[in-house]
Amino acid sequence: MDYLHQETISFEQAVCWIDKFVDEIEGNRNGLEPYPIALRGINWIKFLSKYHPYILAENKRKWDSSLYAQYQILLDNLEYHLLGNHLLEDAFSLLWAGLYFKDEPIYQKAKGLLLRELEEQLLPDGAHYEQSPMYHCILLDRLLDCYNVSVNNLRFIGQEGLNERLREKAGGMLGHLASVVYKDNTIPLLNDSAEGIAPSPTQLFAYAKRLDMDWEKLPMGACGYRKLMAGHWEAIVDVGDIRASYQPGHSHADTFNYELRIGGKPF
């Protein structure tokens, strides 16, 4: 979904890719599912904003029209059937759409959904409730992006209050991440986590610092993880309940699992 922003992709290639997608959209059933729309929408908005001076007016009108129509599909198909990170990604993307199109109904829908889902999905110790360190990093990156775009694009009355809430929730997620990482700042590969998918903790901490955020390590509690350290030994143990109880999609296989590192290497 971030194809447009890869360092090896030229501006011309990106333009061709967007044009091709728009021209073939009627036959692209999978591309019009809500989750792809949510991820693609943010990436298109980033591209359109970054390269605005170089995009032909005709292309801009064509792409904006398609993107707005895609967001109408998303609004009509929010992922309440999946909940979890999918619904949160929908809300993040709608915030970008509301700000980009200066569309208050979309913004208000995003705001309400964001405030509710952040309260529901972030635990008191700052962890995302699906207990996957990788997805925690993905969602933290998205939350930092949303705070960044919202604080720099004030469009609507009361938006500052939303920004403060986004900042507060990001601080909690940063505090949890600071506690759960190993000494080398890598994440434990529990609950569907893998390397090279999400931004690294080092990248996320640096991004948060650029946004002038501060945070403190938060003790691990509700997340169900516990860290044991002695000399060259580091262990992360998953002793918590399956969360979320109504959406165990990412904690289905790792309950009571653990990772052990000795001298910085997996045992």
Predicted regions mapped to residue ranges:
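Carbohydrate-active enzyme catalytic cores, enriched for enzymes
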Residues: A127-F267
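Aromatic-lined, polymer-binding surfaces characteristic
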Residues: M1-A170
